[in-house]
């Protein structure tokens, strides 16, 4: 069973390190998982943080928009790339608890 988590991101650079810690902690119990970040035209360093993360850990993938298309467009692109048996969406600002 593979889990895909699709997360749209727009200017969430401050939240991303904490989000990664929580995702790693909660997903480590599963043998197969991926996290797909869709950067929706961020200008605060989110794109660079996510690119570095994806280069270091193959569980993480990045789709980059060069301007803000909105949450629906971001989710749609994430769904196209997701190949898990289960697909979960969440926000990058930690309003959704990764443990849930």
Question: What residue ranges belong to the model's regions?
Answer:
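Structured catalytic core of nucleotide-sugar glycosyltransferases
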Residues: 1-100
